[in-house]
From Swiss-Prot:
GO terms for biological process: isoleucyl-tRNA aminoacylation. It is found in: Cytoplasm. PANTHER family: ISOLEUCINE--TRNA LIGASE, CYTOPLASMIC, SOLEUCYL-TRNA SYNTHETASE. Monomer. It comes from Methanospirillum hungatei JF-1 (strain ATCC 27890 / DSM 864 / NBRC 100397 / JF-1). A motif ('KMSKS' region) lies at residues 591-595. This is Isoleucine--tRNA ligase.
């Protein structure tokens, strides 16, 4: 045991602790210690290896690490292999940026093989960077052997799963509309589309009804570029549509518009007048044919029979008619399938019109908007700009388009019911994350597009015959090699693309060019990390995962993809319990971004406050499933708590070292936990209380941790440090450590604070692993386990919990607070004693507390006497005040008379009579008035010098009247405080004695300080001598003090000089 620095230096402590962990291989030793324990299988949701971690990533890993440390302290054999998502657009786009590429053509020119190698190196190097960053946050996981989605054995897990889908009839290839990034030239998932506001054209277009002159259907759209692919107009079958004769500049037109929208549409078109000629329902309008206004410019449009159809998604806004292009919209596509419409998509993968786009061929679709608007000519009824939310590619930020393409799909609807039942069978934290949010999302899930038209990813293991179109799915590389007679080792592109397989028809099978959606990659994590399917031993032993946790966006991402893939492969959920956490936002609740200038990095926080403060702040700020609104003031508050913890830990060390204290130990030299149990009944009440408190806290913390309520856990522990330990126990026990002689009381104090600190280290270890390791290292005995993280979790010893004691102490603490409030009202500092404190109560529990803890209550209140009065206090007077809003309705014109009677009456007597009988009768001599409590209120009228405050079930009154004796003690306490501050300024050791010299010119103060008070001052500050002078001139001029200071003590100037005693 050694003394420690007076200030908390987190970065020094954390660097030292992490060095210790590395040199002593503590993580591996903890894992080995638990090797025979029950297995607890955790799967790490893999982050993309794209760069430095951000605050949200840090929160994610800190949350995981805290839970894993907690589980290890329960003796569980925790499977904690880190994971990394190393394929996909996140990596490709970064590499493209490094190489200066703009599109796929640049990649093809560079060479797919060379590009793949650059992606691989990028992913590997950033994996290493991120691992080191996670380690610097104190995160313990298996970073030496993480699962990586680029490894052949991992890739095989995806291949095997797809083969299961194919064999179970869940794999399908079809021509469907998908989200499409024209820059990346690939399909992207719904969850990968990011939305923000953009300006687009908002246009009203007239579609001429076939065979009729000047008669039109009016539609509205924000995507003019999709008009070349129009095949139908949708209406609601129940809406009423009006056939309107509209007049503009003397010309008449017949327009069909939803009846309720006629006026705003015509206003938009600047028509001067109109009349409704007839009406039809949407159902009656269905079947009407019309011509495309662009038919002369797009030959294919002349071949299409354009028809009005009914649809359930049409809303009563704009015109009430929806332009339908099944090749460019999901709802449009589904409607097209239902109604047998053409799925016309004249747009290529880069977003340019193909030859089928007629006059627009070769133009980028969004660039063609203005040309299309111009070509519409008189068919453009009106136009304006609209700001609306529009989707963008999650990686390159390009506005997406919707495009019908050939893709591979998993038929989710076929297994949806099983997925929903598995959601119900899973434990969710919070419950609504699964039972509502995730359940609702899966209920609406459609076929999962698993194919991507890119390069760096897991190649889809489907080989298709060019002759007969038969396909074959390979589940392993070995299976492929056997069929192809090849020796493939790296199943990435372009190597796998070179493998051909003979078809039974005599033709040749070649691999389809697509790669997997990266969400399909990570969906395999729970079995791929166990080596399945190459090795199934660990899988059968451990799967499914006991626990996973990720952000709330993963209900659409990893939670979903895992459940889908696992239902395909094993017909059950891959996880037993799931904790969903929130997003890391700025203080105003905005997403952090460089453009807003509101990004806070984990490194910034660590540089200022250290890792443990960051961890404790993140965990305590809010419930895990709520968004974290990062606030520097909150971090500072947590930092103050950590400093207080350090000071509490530091406080007893000098005394223990001076006294040669060593805590109780067992015969084999280890700390003896049972000593406290054996000695508990002999200990002072305050020691028993803090021991009971920390065990009560331990039980609460354990229950909350089992429900993943980490915010409640960390707040409980911080409150214990601040309120129970620092502001209560340490303040009360401090004088016992100053005792010169050895005594049972001092030993109990040492044993108690050692027990509390060691227990607190264990309770805090999962959340603040560095400071607790440093504290434990200094407190542990030589034969104890070398690390706090090798200790057993303290679940709370019921043998050491005294609920009655805690209740009684709670009364005294509330009394202490009430006294402080009353003193503040009376402007009497706590260091100044008072003669009497009165407690007025009717509560038996309050009376019992003061009966058993009177000495402690007196000491805390700094009072010579406490008087507990049951019922009412005779010196308390009350003034009665009439309540006119009640008196008026009750007594009418007599209200002023009643008011006067109440004001003239004895308020205390009125209050007493109301308490006893519920009513009181007052008379003006001619008439009596019966009043109840609603007719008056009462205000206290305290005697002079007495100030009051309320506490639970009691009122507290402090008599601040000063006597000379009280004044003498008050000044003595003030001088003691100044001398202690001066000792601290000289950095004296606890055992150092000093000589004191005081100049007090005030005659009254000198007369107050009798010998007994001077002895008290010397005793409290280890003063060997204390000389008092009436002026500076009275001092011995030859004596120089190490520290000499002038102090203003309650308006009296006092000069104090101290030196180390010889």
């Amino acid at each position: 045991m050694q003394e420690v620095t007076s200030s908390f230096t987190p970065r020094v402590i954390e660097a030292s602790v992490q060095k210790f962990w590395t040199q002593e291989d503590i993580y591996a030793r903890v894992q080995e210690q638990n090797r025979d324990g029950k297995t607890w299988f955790f799967v790490d949701g893999p982050p993309y290896t794209t760069g430095h971690i951000h605050l949200g990533t840090a929160w994610n890993k800190i949350l995981k690490d805290s839970i894993l440390r907690y589980k290890r302290m329960h003796g569980l054999h925790v499977i904690d292999r880190a994971g990394y998502d190393m394929h996909g657009l996140p990596i490709e786009v970064r590499v493209e940026h490094e190489l200066g590429f703009e599109n796929k053509k640049d990649i093809e020119a560079f060479g797919i093989g060379a590009f793949i190698e650059r992606c691989k190196q990028f992913a590997l190097s950033h994996k290493d960077i991120m691992s080191e960053q996670f380690k610097s946050l104190g995160v313990w996981m298996n970073f030496d052997d993480p699962y990586q989605t680029i490894m052949p054995e991992y890739i095989e897990a995806a291949w095997w799963t797809l083969k299961q889908a194919d064999e179970k009839g869940l794999l399908d290839r079809g021509h469907r509309v998908v989200n499409w990034c024209p820059r990346c030239e690939t399909a992207i998932a719904d969850s990968e589309v990011e939305y923000w506001d953009e300006q687009d054209p908002s246009i009203f277009v007239k579609f001429p009804i076939h065979g009729l002159m000047n008669e039109y259907l009016v539609i509205w759209t924000t995507t003019p570029w999709t008009l070349p692919a129009n095949v139908a107009v949708a209406v609601d079958k129940d809406f009423i549509y009006a056939r309107v004769e509209a007049i503009k500049e003397g010309k008449k037109e017949i327009l069909w518009i939803a009846k309720d929208l006629v006026e705003p549409v015509l206003k938009r078109g600047k028509y001067q007048d109109y009349s409704i000629l007839s009406e039809k329902t949407g159902e009656e309008l269905a079947g009407t044919t019309y011509d495309s206004p662009l038919a002369d410019l797009i030959p294919r449009q002349k071949e299409i029979v354009h028809t009005v159809v009914t649809a359930g998604f049409v809303e009563m806004d704009n015109t009430g008619m929806v332009h339908i292009a099944p090749g460019h919209g999901w709802d449009d596509y589904l409607l097209g399938v239902e109604k047998g419409l053409d799925v016309f998509c004249p747009v290529d993968g880069a977003g340019y019109y193909t030859d089928e786009g007629g006059i627009y061929a070769g133009q980028f679709v969004r660039d063609a908007n203005e040309k299309i608007l111009s070509d519409l000519g008189s068919h453009l009824l009106g136009r304006q700009k609209i700001t609306h939310r529009y989707g963008h590619c999650w990686r390159c930020k390009t506005p997406i388009i919707y495009r019908a393409t050939e893709q591979w799909f998993i038929s989710v609807p076929k297994m949806k019911e099983k997925m929903l039942s598995e959601i119900k069978a899973t434990s969710w934290y919070p419950d609504w994350a699964g039972s509502a949010r995730f359940y609702d999302f899966v209920s609406d899930a459609r076929d999962w597009c698993i194919s991507r038209q890119r390069y760096w990813g897991i190649p889809i293991p489907v080989w298709q015959c060019s002759s007969c179109s038969a396909h074959r799915v390979f589940g392993t590389v070995a299976e492929l090699n056997a069929a192809a007679g090849s020796n493939l080792t790296d199943p990435h592109r372009p190597y796998v693309d070179e493998i051909t397989v003979p078809c039974s028809c005599g033709g040749t099978m070649k691999r389809v060019e697509d790669i997997f959606d990266v969400w399909f990659d990570s969906a395999m994590a729970s079995w791929a990390t166990l080596g399945f399917p190459r090795n199934d031993a660990l899988f059968h032993e451990m799967w499914p995962a006991d626990f996973i946790t990720e952000g709330q966006d993963q209900t659409r991402g990893w939670f979903y993809s895992q459940l889908g893939a696992s239902t395909i492969a094993f017909n059950r959920s891959p996880y037993k319990s799931v904790l969903m956490h929130g997003f890391a936002l700025d203080a105003d609740g905005r997403k952090m971004s460089k453009s807003l200038g509101n990004v806070v990095t984990p490194e910034e926080v660590v540089q200022k406050f250290g890792v443990d403060v960051l961890r404790l702040y993140i965990l305590s700020s809010n419930a895990p499933w709520e968004d974290l609104k990062f606030n520097w003031d909150g971090v500072s508050t947590v930092n103050r708590t950590m400093n207080i913890l350090w000071n509490v830990y530091r406080f007893p060390l000098p005394y223990m070292i001076l006294d040669g204290f060593s805590p109780a130990q067992t015969s084999d030299g280890k700390y003896d936990d049972e000593y406290i149990v054996r000695s508990y009944r002999e200990m002072p009440e305050i020691d028993r209380w803090i021991i009971s408190r920390i065990n009560t806290i331990a039980r609460s913390v354990s229950a909350d941790m089992d429900e993943y309520q980490l915010h409640r856990v960390t707040r409980l522990l911080m409150n214990f440090i601040l309120e129970d330990l620092s502001r209560w126990y340490v303040q009360i026990v401090r004088p016992r450590m100053w005792l010169e002689e050895d005594s049972p009381d001092k030993k109990f104090a040492y044993e108690t604070i050692t027990y509390c600190l060691r227990t607190l280290c264990r309770l805090l270890a999962p959340f603040t692993p560095h400071i607790t390791e440093a504290m434990y290292e200094n407190l542990r005995l030589p034969e104890d386990p070398v690390s706090v993280h090798m200790l057993k979790w303290p679940a709370g010893d019921i043998r050491l919990i005294d609920e009655n004691l805690e209740r009684r102490m709670d009364v005294v603490r509330k009394f202490d607070e009430a006294v402080a409030n009353a003193r503040q009202a009376g402007k009497r500092k706590l260091r100044w004693p008072v003669q009497n404190v009165i407690v007025v109560t009717s509560s038996e529990s309050v009376i019992e507390a003061f009966r058993s803890m009177e000495d402690l209550a007196k000491d805390r209140a700094n009072t010579r006497n406490i008087e507990v009065i049951q019922g009412s206090w005779e010196r308390m007077r009350f003034n009665a005040e009439p309540v006119m809003k009640k008196i008026g309705p009750s007594f009418g014109k007599k209200g002023p008379v009643v008011k006067g009677l109440i004001e003239a009456a004895d308020g205390s007597a009125l209050r007493k009579q109301l308490e006893e009988s519920g009513s009181v009768t007052l008379s003006d001599g001619s008439e009596e008035f019966v009043l109840t409590a609603e007719h008056m209120t009462f205000s206290q009228h305290l005697p002079e010098g007495i100030f009051g405050a309320e506490m639970t079930d009691a009122s507290v009154y402090v008599d601040t009247t000063l006597t000379e004796d009280l004044e003498a003690e008050g000044y003595s306490r003030e001088i003691i405080r100044r001398l202690q501050e001066m000792r601290k300024q000289l950095d004296l050791n606890v055992e150092d004695n000093i000589v004191i010299d005081a100049v007090i010119e005030d005659v009254h103060l000198r007369e107050l300080l009798s010998a007994s008070w001077l002895d008290l001052i010397k005793q409290e500050v280890r003063g060997k001598t204390l000389k008092i002078h009436d002026s500076v001139g009275g001092r011995d001029g030859s004596v120089l003090f190490q520290l000499d200071r002038d102090w203003d003590i309650e308006g009296v100037n006092v000069t104090l000089g101290i030196s180390l005693a010889g």
